[in-house]
Each structure stands twice: as structure tokens, then as C-alpha cells.
């Protein structure tokens, strides 16, 4: 991360839901979020497989929570800098998203298929909450629902600063 020059992350989510108490609420405790940032010196990427997420198929409510320290990097030093210097994970231990899938009633959750959807809501990261909107794919297969989405955020929007000497190197 010391060599990070870009001030944005590309976030990808992949969640596989299974039904809980009633057929309209689906839950996963092992969703996946990854991020990628391209720099001139070195690309930075990490994966977190400990994402908790809930989807209500009757009203389109969707939410997830991720423990920041759960992101794993290829290099230990990157992980250390990410947690201590950039995301300050002791002070801001998790990120959350609370939103809604538009036109959820048009999706037939009893029929296998790929359903492109629009999602919007509030992403809270580093103690800052911002509205985000994007597209996602819902995949229904054998009674299970998988969701995936890719979106970009600007680090500055979430008060995540990169030291000038790192940004300019």
C-alpha cells in the first residue's frame, strides 16, 4: 500500500444466500468482497471471505457488514499499512452497506436464472456514510441466490487519505 497512487478502489461483492426462518429472508455469513487499485508501481488487491449479508426478497432490502481486518493481502506489509495507516481498522472496525434492490417484484425467485438489477443505498466506510448506486446480478439456482456487483469508490469521499509522498512516488 505504500506504493498506492490511485485514490479509488474497485470493489467487487459476491454473496450466496440461503433461506432463514421464512422464505423471504436470505442470509450468508461467508460472502466475499474484494478490492483492486491499480498503481504505476504495484497493483493492490485484497479479499475478505467473512462478509455477513441479508436479503429480503419481498421488499428488496439488502445489507452487508464486513470486518476490515478480514481483508487478506498477498503481502503482509500491505495488510499492515491498510489496517493501521489507511482504514484505521482499530478505530473503524467494519464497513456496512444498507440498501434496496429496485423492482424486486419482477424477479422470480422460484425460477433459476440470471437477473440484472439496480441497487442503491448507503455505504459506511471509515466512519463516513455516502449514497452509492450501481448494478448487480442476482443468480437464482436450485433455491439459492447469489449476488455479485462491481463498483468504484473514491477514497477521499470516505476521508481516507494517502500521504503525499506515497501518492507522488
List each language-model region with its residue ranges.
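Low-complexity, acidic/polar, glycine-enriched regions of mature
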Residues: 23-169
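Bacterial Sec-dependent N-terminal signal peptides
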Residues: 1-26
Amino acid at each position: 500500500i505504500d506504493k498506492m497512487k490511485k485514490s479509488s478502489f474497485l470493489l467487487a461483492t459476491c454473496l450466496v444466500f440461503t433461506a432463514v426462518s421464512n422464505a423471504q429472508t436470505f442470509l450468508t455469513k461467508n460472502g466475499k468482497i474484494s478490492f483492486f487499485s491499480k498503481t504505476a508501481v504495484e497493483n493492490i488487491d485484497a479479499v475478505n471471505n467473512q462478509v455477513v449479508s441479508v436479503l429480503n426478497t419481498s421488499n428488496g432490502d439488502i445489507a452487508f457488514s464486513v470486518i476490515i481486518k478480514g481483508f487478506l493481502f498477498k503481502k503482509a506489509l500491505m495488510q499492515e499499512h491498510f489496517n493501521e495507516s489507511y482504514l484505521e481498522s482499530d478505530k473503524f472496525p467494519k464497513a456496512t452497506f444498507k440498501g434496496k434492490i429496485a423492482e424486486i417484484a419482477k424477479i422470480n425467485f422460484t425460477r433459476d436464472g440470471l437477473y440484472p438489477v439496480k441497487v442503491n443505498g448507503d455505504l459506511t466506510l471509515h466512519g463516513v456514510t455516502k449514497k452509492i448506486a450501481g448494478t448487480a446480478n442476482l443468480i437464482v439456482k436450485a433455491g439459492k441466490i447469489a449476488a455479485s456487483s462491481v463498483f468504484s469508490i473514491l477514497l477521499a469521499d470516505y476521508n481516507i487519505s494517502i500521504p503525499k509522498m506515497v501518492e507522488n512516488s
